[in-house]
Amino acid sequence: MKVLIVKTSSMGDVIHTFPAVEDARLNRPDVSFDWCVEEAFAGIVALHPAIDRIHTVAIRRWRKALLDGGTWREATALRRILRECRYDLVIEAQGLLKSALVARQAGAPIAGFDRSSAREPSATLFYDATYTVPRDLHAIERTRRLFGLALGYQPDLSALDSGIVPPAGDIAGISGRTAFLLHGTSREDKKWPAEDWIETARLLVEREMTPVTTWSNEREKAVAEAIAGAVPSTILVPKSPLAEIAAIIGHSTLIIGADTGLTHLASAFGLPTVAVFLATEPGLTGPRGQYASTLLAAPGERVTPAKVMAETEKLLALKLRAPA
């Protein structure tokens, strides 16, 4: 059986789909999987060994050039390639109109959430089989349940395995006990203040750990340079391809991150990960894993560096006690 997964974005949503793929790999060894994803996240999808072929879309870029002939040539080529693959089933795991339209291009039966479960009920008009999955569950569990219903097995929800390992990469000059500080995030209301990141870096050095940080745009660069300027032992990694950053994250001792896709990647690798959530509900989309913890800003309170460090110490102690 040949199945196409459609989960185009965001990075966190893509990573939240990995446990469902791992369930399916174990329960349905007769099924092969391809994946259709935004071009920016193809390298993330490639981390899972069960994915045979990756098809990329560029919906974000296409929207900015709808009248451009190149846009329509790319979209037409994608439709042709998907149909040539002759899929037996498409699992549309995003529940959005845009992803449903992408799924439709494959010309195969589509399975997805029903109207009460999909994020955009109009997407279900394009599905051939729909399944009820409560919306108040975490995104990881919702996707695992959907895959199980679509492929005919019961996932073991008492266990969680993303099925991915850190990639090999250039981590020259980065060794010892390191803590990667993932301060960058797409929304202003998700950003922990720069002074808190600086104080966290200082506290890490006091505990004989080396802070590591990086950036992906000019605003993030200013924060990264502020951390490195205030705490000189910080390793400042220049803006780098996603695969290289993933390799450095994967070989870190500890991750402290904002609500951002790379924080989810760290928890999927099984690393001690402390996420600082300031604006979103972690019960539905927060990092999950044996060594993942989320600190949520309560009304009228703030997440302090001291609270973050206390949480990191708990996770590191838990990891130390774990069997090899």
Ranges and model annotations:
Residues 1-324:
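Catalytic machinery of carbohydrate-active enzymes
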